Structures are given as structure tokens and as C-alpha cells.
């Protein structure tokens, strides 16, 4: 077997090569309740103002501000209540001299009124109340169009539909939404040493953990996943299953078979399917032998058989590819700063990614490596919610150093409730 030449490239360049490929998914229409985590296929433009009318943000009384002038603790001014309305109701009364309408949160401001007095700012007595301070025009009023005006772009094409976007779409009556179809993913674990989850352990064998992990990572993105039978180290069967997966899926992910061992056949498989290898070595640890190929608008990811390296490869390279195929506005991993709370003394000839646990505090984010951090480690992944990114050419970092982290989970818990 001829060992393929590998020239390492930086992580950023590897991601850029992925997103430079011409690969896009078609637009489809889905029900609003099925649109979460999809990418919008078009701008959403406001068809009316929000709020649609001047409304009260509080429970209280709608008054004419001019009638409140001169009010003080020594000169309380009295108002007569002429009507009572709740949200969804409109008063048919015109508020006149020293008159008021009892109004609930969200209700439309009645004609004649231009300020709202909160209940707690009054002393009530039957159908009257008094106030002890003056109010200005439009005080305590949410004005028509103050949030959004007709014609404003309220959601952009390429934006991820999150729960907030769902609320906006519902507000403007989108029972169906035009989105980009999400790619389907094939997951193929390779290696004669692999056993299925329910198999009894044998000497020299390990259970397939990467396949279920990748499936979970893909399903977390809302992707349709096809799981293929674990492949033994055989070139012909490997070519056959990859070809089959390419016919049915937009992305094919294999784990294992990407190194330079006697039974690592992935380079030969890529040649057989006429895929262009975008890169086959990345200047990083773990996952340096991560390989990505491309053919006919489809991505083929060769991730390491080592669990931590496999996880890192998915986060750094598969996620951006999925976002790119769906036309997302942001495709690169988002990086934030955090304070390292433990020494990490290992030298880093290449960019190193460490599984870690981030915590949000009043002073900012802190991060602690999550246990054993070799490429074959699996338990550390379960206790991590981020990856620390240490630059190449460094000789370790002391506690207190500011580092870059990539959040991989949304459970970066607060150390304390920040009020």
C-alpha cells in the first residue's frame, strides 16, 4: 500500500476550502411548527407596524397628560373613571377633562388619552383616583410602529429559525415558511475492531461509539440520518457502501480508515468515487488526519476513529458544511473569550482543541479542561460543553490566561444567579 502524501493546512483554511465549494440545497415550504432550526430561504418583511396601535404596557389608567400638570404630594389631582377595557378591547369613549379609562396591559390607548398612570401610582376610591406627579405626553405608552414599521426586514434570508423567529413568523401570519431543505447524512463506522452496542466484548475489540455519537450530533442539527452497518477493513465493500450512501444522501461521514495504517482505505475509496480531496491533513490536535472530499455537490468527511478527534472534526468541519449548504449567514464556528482556571502544560506544536467545561460568571466566562484529554478519550466529551482552542507554537498555558473557546453545547451554566 502506497502512503499518500499529506501536507497539513491551518484549520481556518480547511474550513474555507469546504465552504468554497458549490453546494446548495433547494428551498422547500414547511409548516411553521416544523421550521425550528431550518434556514430561512427568503427575507421576511413586515406587512404592518408593531405595535399596530398605541397601547399600554402596564395595567393602569389612560389619561390626558395635560390634566396631570401641577400634581404633587401636596396637590393631588383627581380623575373620574369613565370606562374599563382589557387587552383586545377598544374603548368607545373619548377621554375628556380629568377623565380616565381603566386599561389593562396590551389594550389600545383610547381616543383623547396620551399617557398611562400605573395602578401603583394612584390612590383609588370607587370610580375616582388621585395622582401625586405630573405625566408627560406618551409616558408609559408603547407607540405604534416603535419596534417595527411596515416594510422593515424583520428576518433575513440565511438566518437560523430559532424560537424568537418562530414568534415573529407567527406574528405576521406565516402558517407555512419557505426554508432551505436540510441535507441528509450517511454515517458509516469502519474498522474490523468494532462491535455493535449490544455485542459482547471480545479481546482486541471495542464497541462502536463514534457512529451513535455522530448520529446524535447530526440529529441535534435537525438532519435526517442514515446509519449503515459497521464496515470491516475491506476496500471493495468500503467502496460499495460509500457509493450506495452517496446515491441516497447529501453528506457521507465515515469514521476510521483515514490514517496511514495498512488497513486505512479511505484515500482509495475517494479515488474510486472520483471525489476531489480538499485536504487530508490539518495542522491541529486531535484530528490531524481529518480528510474531506467533494464530488457532484456532495461532501465526504473522513473523520478519525478516535472519539475525541471524531467529535472535533464534526464540530469544526461538518457543521460549517451543513450551514453552507443551507445558505446560512454565519458558517464559521463562533469563538468567545474565557479565563483558563487550570494549568495546561502540554506543548502545542499545532493548534490544539481541548474538551472543556465553560461557566459564565459575573466577571465573564471561565473554562476548565474536562478530564482526560487524549484523542482516543470518550468520557471527557460527555462532560464538556466547549472546546478550548490553543494556538500552535505555544508551550502550555497557566491558569488565569485568556483563551479562545468554541461552545459546543448551550448549557454553559452560570456560577450564580446574576441579578
Regions found by a protein language model. Name each.
Residues 3-11, 175-303, 307-313, 419:
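Helix-rich terminal scaffold detector
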Residues 7, 11-15, 28, 32, ...:
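Generic structural signal for well-ordered, non-membrane alpha-helical segments
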Residues 19-26, 43, 109, 155-158, ...:
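Structural signal for hydrophobic packing residues in well-ordered secondary-structure cores
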Residues 28-33, 42, 88, 148, ...:
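Flexible glycine/proline-rich
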